Structure formats: structure tokens, C-alpha cells
């Protein structure tokens, strides 16, 4: 089962939390659609800012958005001008009061989304896929990862027939639920068509906190 299912969704509620934190009964569809529009807008607006994750929380008429990025300076701008402009744009998009929190990604080479985007951008720049994949894997392992697996599918090097190529280094225990595995899927738009880039990064185990013993001596 661990080989097929999305590793992130499999671990939600165990070692992962939801990226959307709100509850609604009647307005669920409207909130979900609004979340999709917010994520799409941020992804397009900050396409060059190495944004990995967008977390959304809701409270009454307020939306709190946490943006995880490897380039916080680019998102914030000089004197906070860029993030303030983004906040106003999202206010207009949602019709609600929006608060934005910027969280820096200290080690971008351990983030599957950013590693996948790096490979995709190289493929779009006509770099050989094996070179792009192995280079990304070496950087990730040097950054302290326990294992990494990358997979590229499509018309590789402009071949007439599409195929799948995968490489791995270290261990990636997909069945172990306490294993901290980051996963991403990114598209590369090349002159020969789209290529799908999948990345799995194993960053070690997250052990559940032990409950303190009651009535200890």
C-alpha cells in the first residue's frame, strides 16, 4: 500500500498535519474553492520565490496564510512592500481580512517540492535528465537526507515513445508511518511535451512524544 498511495496523505494525523485548518458544514464547497484560488494565485504570483507549502487557517471573517519559502526576502520585499501588496491582492480576491506569515525554509535541498522544481527547470533548459536527477540527489544527500528517490516520466530527451526513469540513493521506507518522507510531483514543460517529476526524500524518523506518567514517585 505504501508504494502506491501519496506518502503525505498517508501520514496525515500521524506525523503530518493538514495544510488547510478550518471546519465548515454549509460553506465547505465555497471555502474549498477559495482555498484553491488562493493557492493558485500565490503559486503564480511567487513563481520565482521558491515557495514550497501554503497553509491556510480560517477564523470568522479572517484568513491566516503561512507561506513556506526558501527566499523570504523576495516575498517580503524592501520594507515589507511586496508582502503588503500581496496581502491587499488576496484581500480583494477573497473579500476577507488576510494575514500573511512568512516562514523560511532553512534547507531547501531537503524539501521535495523545491528539489523537484529544480529538476524540472533544468529539464526545461534542455539539461540531460540523468545529469539533473543525479545532481539533485547528490545535493540532497549532502544536506543530511537519509535517502532520496527521483522519477521522471514522458518523452525523455525527445524520444518518440514516452518512458519512466527512476533513480534512488539511500533508503526510502514508504511503509513506515513514522518515517518523515517528503513527496512532491512537478511538471516540466519542454518543447517535446510535458514531463512529470516525482521526488521522495527521507529525512529520518519522527517518534511520537511519550506521555508523561501520572502519579510518579
From Swiss-Prot:
| One GO BP annotation of this record | translation
An example of a Pfam family matching this protein is: KH_2
UniProt keywords, alphabetically: Ribonucleoprotein, Ribosomal protein, RNA-binding, rRNA-binding
- Name the HAMAP family for this protein: Ribosomal_uS3_B
Q: Sorted alphabetically, which NCBIfam families does this protein's record hold?
A: rpsC_bact
Task: Describe the family membership recorded for this protein in Swiss-Prot or TrEMBL.
Answer: Belongs to the universal ribosomal protein uS3 family.
**Protein name from the UniProt record:** Small ribosomal subunit protein uS3
Query: What organism is listed for this UniProt entry?
Result: Lactiplantibacillus plantarum (strain ATCC BAA-793 / NCIMB 8826 / WCFS1)
Amino acid at each position: 500500500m505504501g508504494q502506491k498511495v501519496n506518502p503525505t496523505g498517508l501520514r496525515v494525523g500521524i506525523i503530518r498535519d493538514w495544510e488547510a485548518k478550518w471546519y465548515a458544514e454549509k460553506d465547505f464547497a465555497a471555502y474549498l474553492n477559495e482555498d484553491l484560488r488562493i493557492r493558485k494565485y500565490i503559486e503564480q504570483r511567487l513563481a520565482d520565490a521558491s515557495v514550497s507549502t501554503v497553509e491556510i487557517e480560517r477564523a470568522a471573517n479572517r484568513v491566516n496564510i503561512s507561506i513556506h519559502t526558501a527566499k523570504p526576502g523576495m516575498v517580503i520585499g524592501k520594507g515589507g512592500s511586496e508582502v503588503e501588496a500581496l496581502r491587499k491582492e488576496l484581500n480583494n480576491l477573497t473579500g476577507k481580512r488576510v494575514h500573511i506569515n512568512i516562514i523560511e525554509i532553512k534547507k531547501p535541498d531537503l524539501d521535495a517540492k523545491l528539489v523537484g522544481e529544480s529538476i524540472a527547470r533544468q529539464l526545461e533548459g534542455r539539461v540531460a535528465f540523468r545529469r539533473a536527477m543525479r545532481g539533485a540527489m547528490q545535493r540532497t544527500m549532502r544536506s543530511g537526507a537519509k535517502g532520496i528517490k527521483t522519477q521522471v516520466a514522458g518523452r525523455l530527451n525527445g524520444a518518440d515513445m514516452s518512458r519512466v526513469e527512476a533513480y534512488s540513493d539511500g533508503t526510502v521506507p514508504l511503509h513506515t508511518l513514522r518515517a518523515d518522507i517528503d513527496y512532491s510531483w512537478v511538471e516540466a514543460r519542454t518543447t517535446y511535451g510535458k514531463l512529470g517529476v516525482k521526488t521522495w526524500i527521507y529525512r529520518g524518523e519522527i517518534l511520537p512524544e511519550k506521555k508523561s506518567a501520572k502519579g510518579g514517585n
